[in-house]
């Protein structure tokens, strides 16, 4: 009986390990393919970063592309809203990168001017420029807790979610923080952390394959 129970436990453990390894391989391959798509726009990224004196932020630009579109589609940096005030207007990758880098440069410049950290500028790429002044008034450094407060009490109600309702958002950062939730119309309070993670992925890829 004990042998049988041990065999069942052993088989169960093996199945779990196999599933975990298989899942890790699947996600690693999916990430690798997405990064390859992002890297395919190296020429356009270099041109835009040189144009806006953002050469030191190439990896960050790529991380934003990976975060926003995984290198697929036309509006790679989801730049339509910053350029036109609405989504799905830009339908050209080069235009999207040019506008995205321009907007990111504006956020970085404003964050430096206000004495805030780089993470604030990155989060403002998602929340909008007003977030920078908010961070300045609250210590000058972006945190998920501060971003959550802004999302819940300012951005979300401003865009119509007065009841502060939430929806499911399955990312490592969100699951560990609050079980996996964002506020409707409240942007992504985990944006800066996700971009930071993706920047490390970009850098690791380039060290291995470039």
PLM region descriptions:
Residues 73-75, 204-205:
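Short, solvent-exposed loop/turn elements at domain surfaces
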Residues 55-71, 79, 97-101, 121-127, ...:
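Short, functionally critical alpha-helical segments immediately adjacent to catalytic or ligand/cofactor-binding
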Residues 77-85:
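Short linear capping/connector segments at secondary-structure termini
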Residues 7-9, 56-57, 75:
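Poly-acidic low-complexity segments
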Residues 2-38, 44, 51-52, 87-98, ...:
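Non-catalytic cell-wall polysaccharide-engagement segments
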Residues 74-77, 135-136:
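Short, solvent-exposed loop/turn and secondary-structure capping segments
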Residues 49-50, 58:
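Short, surface-exposed loop and linker segments with low hydrophobicity and enrichment for Pro/Ser/Thr
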């Amino acid at each position: 009986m004990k042998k049988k129970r041990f065999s069942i436990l052993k088989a169960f453990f093996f199945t779990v390990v196999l599933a975990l390894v298989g899942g890790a391989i699947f996600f690693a391959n999916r990430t690798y393919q997405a990064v390859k798509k992002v890297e395919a726009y190296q020429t356009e990224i270099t041109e835009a970063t040189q144009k806006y004196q953002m050469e030191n932020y190439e990896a960050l630009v790529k991380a934003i592309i990976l975060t926003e579109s995984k290198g697929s589609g036309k509006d790679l940096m989801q730049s339509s809203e910053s350029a036109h005030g609405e989504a799905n207007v830009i339908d050209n990758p080069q235009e999207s990168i040019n506008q995205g880098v321009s907007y990111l440069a504006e956020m970085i410049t404003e964050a430096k001017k206000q004495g805030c950290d780089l993470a604030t500028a990155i989060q403002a790429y998602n929340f909008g420029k007003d977030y920078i002044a908010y961070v300045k008034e609250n210590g000058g450094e972006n945190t998920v807790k501060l971003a959550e407060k802004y999302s819940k009490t300012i951005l979300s109600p401003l865009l119509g979610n007065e009841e502060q309702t939430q929806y499911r958002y399955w990312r490592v950062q969100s699951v560990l923080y609050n079980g996996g939730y964002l506020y409707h119309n409240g942007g992504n309070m985990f944006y800066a952390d996700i971009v930071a993670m993706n920047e490390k992925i970009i850098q690791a890829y380039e060290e291995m394959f470039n």
